[in-house]
Regions:
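Thiamine diphosphate
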Residues: 105, 112, 456-550
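A general structural motif
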Residues: 48, 107-109, 187-199, 257-261, ...
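N-terminal alpha/beta PP-like core and its mobile active-site loop of ThDP/TPP-dependent enzymes
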Residues: 1-337, 373, 377-380, 460-463, ...
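Catalytic phosphate/nucleotide-handling subdomain of diverse soluble enzymes
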Residues: 418, 422-462, 466
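Phosphate/pyrophosphate-binding active-site segments
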Residues: 134, 170, 180-183, 202, ...
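Glycine-rich phosphate/pyrophosphate-binding loop at beta-loop-alpha junctions
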Residues: 7-12, 447-450, 469-472
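Short glycine/threonine-rich loop-to-helix capping motif typified by GTGT followed
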Residues: 33, 221-227, 397-402, 450-453, ...
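Active-site diphosphate/adenylate-binding microenvironment
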Residues: 4-8, 12, 25, 30-35, ...
Length: 582
């Protein structure tokens, strides 16, 4: 048995079923072991290591299991970093395995001599270099356990010559007994102290206008959130990663928060006197109640994130579902439902506006039309992954999450490009579910080569590309946040439908809003991997639900300072936002 065999068999013992990676001479020993164990563990070969890291992150997000990615020494390991930071910042358990050069040539400027164990110090909560064959079992067990326990990244750096060394008894130190470690991981059953629960209940019972902010940590607590909202008469505001925490047809939710959120959500944050945060580290604190405005209670699994975004009075450390179940019996039902009713009335108006914008027949086609037509046709088991950019606005606002669906994106890192890798990982994890990527042309083109990975492995994913030939989010940030004319954001057009065909998939194109629904239906019903290229208006602004005076001023400044499309942009913005701008 080689050292690489010990690694692979340890991963199998930990229940790892798939590894995402790209071969290289720095991991040849591991590749050989994966070949000989291919009936027990599957290798998904990607075209870029960044895709492998994103796939491991997406796999872990959608399954709750450990995601594993593999890269060779030097540049291969470096390419993993962006996807690993995505996992780190969103609190996702991922194990990265990288090669290193020969153990006695490390640090001698040999080929691909990059000290990846040093490079990964910041991104990984566990980060070790293998020192010999008898070291592998201990380190692999500890790496897997740490990633799962801390919901974070672990990294193993494995010198290439050690990978192929035979495991021999005489190599062991006297304290390193064979099999003294195990593949056991126990999920925490931690519940808050009863005194903390009562103190939290007292605050929530005293509140007159209670709002709930739900994030990714609340995804498994839908029923408990709705029960809490009913008792407290509280609207549920959702962070992006919590899009599926409560379905959008729930009478309790006001949808998203922040730049991509809804007006009723923002009003709930501005007017509440009590805030319950459930499993969220939503980073844009300017959209939350001002410090001192509301009394705060937070439910959070990670103690170090307690009070991170808002000065809460009580922190309840524990799983969202179980903690809510313990807290609910201590609450009194509020007779005054006016705060919730105002939010519900606001949401009725909001959805009417969203539908009106999404059913326009203007040409060029509006991006909202594409999102709306997709949302209507998604199956109840759909898993929808999004990229970062203006695409996120339409994903957040125009696609209504239904119970049973899953949604995710790069929440805190806000990286471009994970939409496609997330979707492939979801399809591998759930081969019978509908898996869709909703992406922009800018983000998709960064890792578009891996569409051929979906073709190779016969993954029937669907990729909706909203094509506006611009880096839209950067463009609008230049204008609205800084008052500058757009610069450096135009993208040279790519024929994505032809690209799909070149990869062995199927491509569709739609430009006419009258044809969007029919084309979308045909595209979604195709049995194999497919791309829908939806050509949309590049001048459609993803403006906030409530435009601040400063933003309006900067917007006007950018037009006055020579914005090349100022006339068309002004007309489009005014037609949408006149009520907020006057």
């Amino acid at each position: 048995m080689t050292a690489a065999d010990v690694l692979v068999e340890s991963l199998i013992d930990w229940g790892v079923e798939v590894i995402f990676g790209l071969p290289g001479d720095g991991i040849n020993g591991i590749m050989e072991s994966l070949r000989t164990h291919q009936n027990q563990i599957r290798l998904i070969q990607v075209r870029h290591e960044e895709s492998a890291a994103f796939m491991a992150c997406g796999y872990a997000k959608y399954t709750g299991k450990l995601g594993v990615c593999l890269a060779t020494s030097g540049p291969g390991g470096i390419h993993l970093l962006n996807g690993l930071y995505d996992a780190k910042l969103d609190g996702i358990p991922v194990l990265a395995i990288s090669g290193l050069q020969f153990h006695d040539l490390i640090g001698t400027y040999t080929q691909q001599d990059v000290a990846l164990d040093k490079l990964f110090i910041d991104v990984a909560v566990f980060n070790e270099r293998i020192m010999g064959p008898t070291h592998v079992e201990n380190i692999t067990d500890l790496a897997c356990r740490t990633a799962l326990a801390y919901h974070n990244v672990a990294h193993i750096a494995f010198p290439v010559d050690i990978q192929e060394m035979e495991l021999k008894k005489r190599q062991r130190s006297k304290r390193n007994l064979p099999h003294h470690t195990s593949d056991v991981y126990s999920r925490s059953a931690r519940l808050p102290d009863t005194r903390d629960l009562q103190e939290a209940a007292d605050i929530l019972n005293a509140g007159k206008k209670v709002a709930i902010l739900a994030g990714r940590g609340a995804l498994n607590a839908t029923d408990e959130l709705e029960q809490m909202a009913e008792l407290l008469g509280a609207p549920i505001v959702k962070a992006l990663l919590g899009k599926a925490a409560v379905p959008d047809d729930s009478p309790y939710t006001t949808g998203g928060i922040g730049l991509l959120g809804t007006r009723p959500s923002q009003e709930a944050m501005e007017d509440c006197d009590t805030l319950l945060i459930v499993g969220s580290s939503f980073p844009y604190i300017e959209f939350m109640p001002k410090p001192g405005q509301a009394r705060g209670v937070q439910i959070e699994l990670d103690p170090k994130r307690m009070g991170l975004r808002y000065p809460v009075e009580v922190g309840l450390v524990g799983d969202s579902r179980n903690t809510l179940r313990e807290l609910t019996p201590l609450l009194q039902r509020k007779d005054d439902r006016s705060f919730l009713q105002a939010a519900q009335a606001g949401m009725k108006d909001w959805w009417a506006v969203m539908e009106k914008r999404a059913t326009r027949r203007d040409k060029p086609m509006k991006p909202q039309v594409v999102a709306w037509e997709l949302g209507k046709r998604l199956r109840n088991d759909a898993i929808v992954s999004c990229d970062s950019g203006t695409i996120t606005t339409w994903w957040a606002r125009q696609i209504k999450a239904r119970r049973g669906q899953m949604y995710s994106l790069s929440g805190t890192l806000a990286s471009m490009a994970p939409g496609l890798p997330y979707t492939m990982a979801a399809q591998i994890a759930y081969p019978d579910r509908q898996c869709v990527a909703f992406v922009g042309d800018g983000g998709f083109s960064m890792l578009m080569a891996d569409f051929v990975t979906a073709v190779k492995y016969k993954l029937p994913i669907k990729v909706v590309i909203v094509k506006n030939n611009t880096l839209g989010q950067i463009k609008w940030e230049q204008m609205v946040f800084l008052g500058n004319p757009e610069y450096g954001v135009d993208l040279y057009p790519i024929d994505f439908a032809s690209f799909a065909l070149a990869c062995g998939g199927v491509g569709f194109t739609v430009e006419d809003p009258d044809q969007c629904g029919a084309t979308m239906g045909e595209f979604l019903n195709h049995p194999g991997p497919a791309i829908l290229e939806a050509v949309v208006d590049p001048l459609e602004p993803p403006l906030p639900a409530k435009v601040k005076a400063e933003q309006a001023l900067h917007f006007a400044e950018s037009l006055a300072r020579g914005e090349p499309n100022r006339k068309e942009i002004a007309l489009t913005a005014i037609s949408q936002k006149v009520r907020e701008l006057i």
